[in-house]
Curated annotation (Swiss-Prot):
<keyword id="KW-0648">Protein biosynthesis</keyword>
<dbReference type="Pfam" id="PF16658">
    <property type="entry name" value="RF3_C"/>
</dbReference>
<feature type="binding site">
    <location>
        <begin position="142"/>
        <end position="145"/>
    </location>
    <ligand>
        <name>GTP</name>
    </ligand>
</feature>
<dbReference type="InterPro" id="IPR031157">
    <property type="entry name" value="G_TR_CS"/>
</dbReference>
<dbReference type="InterPro" id="IPR053905">
    <property type="entry name" value="EF-G-like_DII"/>
</dbReference>
<dbReference type="InterPro" id="IPR000795">
    <property type="entry name" value="T_Tr_GTP-bd_dom"/>
</dbReference>
<protein>
    <recommendedName>
        <fullName>Peptide chain release factor 3</fullName>
    </recommendedName>
</protein>
<dbReference type="InterPro" id="IPR027417">
    <property type="entry name" value="P-loop_NTPase"/>
</dbReference>
<keyword id="KW-0963">Cytoplasm</keyword>
<dbReference type="GO" id="GO:0016149">
    <property type="term" value="F:translation release factor activity, codon specific"/>
</dbReference>
<dbReference type="InterPro" id="IPR041732">
    <property type="entry name" value="RF3_GTP-bd"/>
</dbReference>
<comment type="function">
    <text>Increases the formation of ribosomal termination complexes and stimulates activities of RF-1 and RF-2. It binds guanine nucleotides and has strong preference for UGA stop codons. It may interact directly with the ribosome. The stimulation of RF-1 and RF-2 is significantly reduced by GTP and GDP, but not by GMP.</text>
</comment>
<dbReference type="Pfam" id="PF22042">
    <property type="entry name" value="EF-G_D2"/>
</dbReference>
<dbReference type="InterPro" id="IPR004548">
    <property type="entry name" value="PrfC"/>
</dbReference>
<comment type="similarity">
    <text>Belongs to the TRAFAC class translation factor GTPase superfamily. Classic translation factor GTPase family. PrfC subfamily.</text>
</comment>
<dbReference type="InterPro" id="IPR005225">
    <property type="entry name" value="Small_GTP-bd"/>
</dbReference>
<dbReference type="InterPro" id="IPR035647">
    <property type="entry name" value="EFG_III/V"/>
</dbReference>
Length: 529
């Protein structure tokens, strides 16, 4: 029975993203999860400048050079009778929009915290996004094999700064050179750490209880006393893990380990299998769509141009919300009202792509995009659905783009159009000139756009400053007032890459004045796709 198979496939899926501050060890963590899922045989020493093996999930050249994840990688692998869909999000702050969109496509998230630094600014921002969607969070305190802050102090900080209740599942014994392992409070078992096995999977020694003379001797009396004292405090104060509170994003299970040392990474996967939700109902404008519905539905949350320089292609990443994809499936592209037959959908392992025979709710599939698919598009078996919650944010920095070679303006327009479609930047075309203005969240984004224009479109460009402070999407229900506004504000109006009218404000004061002068006009700082 199809319904039974659908329910079984949905129950075995876990789709989650990894979020963290840059350098907390997110890419290393991603790679070790792949190692445990047997998706890769040996872990490359991630980001090691000496090593020629760069992290598996950082596949774009610029990412390899800079050592930061700029685009979202999607990876699928099996683990203990489950299918894991792992989304690695950009760790750099300039790419918050991409991260936000990724978080609309997952059912839960893994928060990686650097044990030496604690809660950092980027983590706070990402948690705000998770809170908007009540995303369940599992926390991993990383780098236990280095000198870190006191674990109790870290828990306190997570609770106070991120406003989420911590439930330690494991508790660390020692740190840095003296790191001996973790004690699992639920199982009453001690997992012993052995250094030097970071890139392979080795059997870990597990003992019942935690008080063992040889372990005590190994870590020394001081570290042992500190461990016992903090463990006692944790056991006294620890509230039990309440799955309901966890699913509401109010409580987070906390695990300790070292991704580089490949220790306790399997605890993370087990936690997702045991506690994290399977694919749930997804909100559309019309109604909530349940994962176990038989009709197919899915939405595009990301577009990536030139994933394979050999193919000069664009791939649309789609999260399946209900039903089943199979080769040759006919689906309706709701925004343009057209039926399409998809026979060449892709599955991913960070740049390695394979054609796909079937996929189920929770899975992320790639569709070849010939310029017709946009971020936020919905595909269904025929029902007119519009999935919600995938916004464009107003950029905070602006530059005018100039060509070194004026004959390449066609390539520049094509490049900027495609890069804006995939969300790498936003493009604005003022009504009073032929200028092309790019908007970004941070400086690095400009570098990425210039780099990709050069590498992928063979266009050499330079940036010039421009007196734009911020941008707002403008809308008005009263056509007469709107036309009057368009005449008066003509010099500051532009059209974005999607053809929407925007107001380019030279200063905050100017924007405030315009809002006061034109109370019937809506000045929006986000636009849904």
């Amino acid at each position: 029975m199809f319904k039974d198979q659908l329910a079984k496939e949905v129950n075995s899926r876990r789709t989650f993203a990894i979020i963290s501050h840059p350098d907390a060890g997110k890419t290393t963590m991603t790679e070790k999860l792949l190692l445990w899922g047997k998706a890769i045989q040996v872990a490359g020493m991630v980001k090691s400048r000496k090593s020629d093996r760069s992290a598996t999930s950082d596949w774009m050249e610029m990412e390899k050079e800079r050592g930061i994840s700029i685009t979202t990688s999607v990876m699928q692998f099996p683990y203990k009778q489950h299918t894991i869909n792992l989304l690695d999000t950009p760790g750099h702050e300039d790419f918050s929009e991409d991260t936000y969109r990724t978080l609309t496509a997952v059912d839960s998230a893994l928060m990686v915290i650097d044990g030496a630094k604690g809660v950092e600014e980027r983590t706070i921002k990402l948690m705000e996004v998770c809170r908007m969607r009540d995303t369940p969070i599992i926390s991993f305190v990383n780098k236990m094999d280095r000198e870190i802050r006191e674990p109790l102090e870290l828990l306190d900080e997570i609770e106070n700064v991120l406003n989420i209740r911590c439930v330690p599942i494991t508790w660390p014994l020692g740190m840095g050179r003296d790191f001996a392992g973790v004690y699992n409070l639920l199982e009453n078992k001690l997992y012993l750490y052995k250094a030097g096995f970071g890139s392979t999977i080795t059997d870990i020694e597990v003992r019942d209880g935690y008080d063992h003379a040889d372990v005590r001797e190994k870590v020394g009396e001081l570290a042992w006393a500190s461990f016992e004292e903090s463990l006692e405090l944790v056991q006294m104060a620890n509230e039990p893990l309440d799955r309901e509170l966890f699913l509401q994003g109010k409580q987070t299970p906390v695990l300790f380990g070292t991704a580089l040392g490949n220790f306790a990474v399997d605890h993370v996967l087990d936690a997702f299998i045991n506690w994290a939700p399977e694919p749930k109902a997804h909100p559309a404008q019309e109604r909530n769509v349940d994962a176990t519905e038989e009709g197919f539905s899915g939405f595009v949350f990301k577009i990536q141009a030139n994933m394979d320089p050999k193919h000069r292609d664009r791939i649309a990443f789609m999260r399946i919300c209900s039903g089943k994809y199979e080769k040759g499936l006919k689906m309706n592209h709701v925004r343009i009202g057209k039926d399409v037959r998809i026979s060449d959908a892709l599955t991913f392992l960070a740049g390695e792509r394979e054609h796909l025979e079937e996929a189920w709710p929770g899975d992320i599939i790639g569709l070849h995009n010939h310029g017709t698919i946009q971020i936020g598009d919905t595909f269904t078996s025929g029902e007119k659905l519009h999935f919600t919650g995938i916004p464009h944010f107003a950029p905070e920095m602006f530059r005018r783009v100039r060509l070194r070679d004026p004959l390449k303006s066609k390539q520049l327009q094509k490049g900027l159009k495609e890069l804006s479609e995939e969300g790498a930047t936003q493009v604005f075309m003022p009504q009073i000139s032929n200028d092309l203005i790019v908007g970004a969240v941070g400086v690095l984004q400009f570098d990425v756009v210039a780099y990709r224009l050069k590498e992928e479109y063979k266009v050499d460009c330079i940036y010039e400053p421009i007196s734009v402070n911020t941008v707002r999407w403008v809308h008005c229900d009263d056509e007469k007032i709107f036309n009057e506004f368009k005449k008066k504000a003509h010099d500051q109006l532009s059209v974005d890459g999607g053809g929407h009218l925007t107001y380019l404000a030279p200063s905050r004061v100017n924007l405030q004045l315009m809002q006061e002068r034109w109370p019937d006009i809506q000045f929006r700082n986000t636009r849904e796709h």
